[in-house]
């Protein structure tokens, strides 16, 4: 173990040239790679020889020379060593003063080295009382910072923002700076970075830390984005969608966070108004509708339906005659539809290619499925193209109530599914859907499937044999959520 680090300490300095050959580049890469491999299984106490390796890397990164060396590989080794080291030992090798100087250096490699050290600080709030966080913020929100540096700083935020002291340093100590960037920054790239930072902080935020003036976006800013820069508007949509998703995901462990959504109510209604009047804003209709729909979907899944019901009744109007009714029925929470739009559910969800997305959505609720199952007949399913059949069955095979219905009431469909005749499976997409349906079904108890369990396992074996020479990974859920 120690030998590989001793070797790099002895040999690497002699390979550092500014115009070296491919041979010297390959040799230096080999030395670095050996160290990386040695670290994989390393669990002991770092040695003085390893300390010397870190010091060597520091000197290389600090040099004004651009050596013929793989700097990405070197940074990877630095990262792995920082991870493996006890952090008090790291602080003996990197003082706060050194890190600040490195972060302020015009040499980007040193900036990124500092990011690595701060990212893996232990505890994560260790540097909250230093200026390092302030400098990182300045560089993160500097339009001249490179993509590599910005990505490295984002890793710092994602790792350290879980600490309340770090969040306080970012959101309170730097409140004036962040507010200035938010309200006065004409650069869309920097504004988008700020939104990303706020999203990261919000993930760990307590509801008491939520400041409307920082986390909310004014009506003027949103309208200016609609008129002048649709990409900024899309970023704002994605920002709020992420905020709402975080609240929904954390509703069990952090229920008080729902107040943040209520604070956003006026903004939500503004998005609804923009949707309702989309004909006045061609860019929204052409580029941003899908982003609004993602936001509406998340809001419809909240247990507290007051905000979404107000949005529905006042602006998006889930009702007959709405040109986007099929879309809404395909992604709005089926439980919301069941509670508020029962008559529409009763009139929709017929088995035809144009309404498969509706049935797939309604299948996720047992209440909705009980209403539409009368429309799901073997004749209608088998009348559709085979791919559409599989798309429908892929969703029906995920829930116990619809699996039971499929196994007990649609024998013709089950028979078609397990048929050994695969001539209709002309493309890989169809094959993948069929295999996913079969896999979903055989996950259920034998009692649930009755006589179909054994034929399904045989059908799976046949599928695997049919495409034995191909990778059988599926990507269905990414296409149909």
Curated annotation (Swiss-Prot):
Protein name listed in UniProt: DNA mismatch repair protein HSM3
Gene: HSM3
Protein purpose: Involved in DNA mismatch repair in slow-growing cells. Acts as a chaperone during the assembly of the 26S proteasome, specifically of the base subcomplex of the 19S regulatory complex (RC).
Family the UniProt entry places it in: Belongs to the proteasome subunit S5B/HSM3 family.
Protein origin, superkingdom: Eukaryota
Keyword list, A-Z: Chaperone, Cytoplasm, DNA damage, DNA repair
Xref: InterPro entries: HSM3_C, HSM3_N
GO biological process: mismatch repair; proteasome regulatory particle assembly
Any one annotated GO CC term: cytosol
Subcellular location: Cytoplasm
Major localisation: cytoplasm
GO molecular function: protein folding chaperone
Record-linked Pfam families: HSM3_C (PF18794), HSM3_N (PF18795)
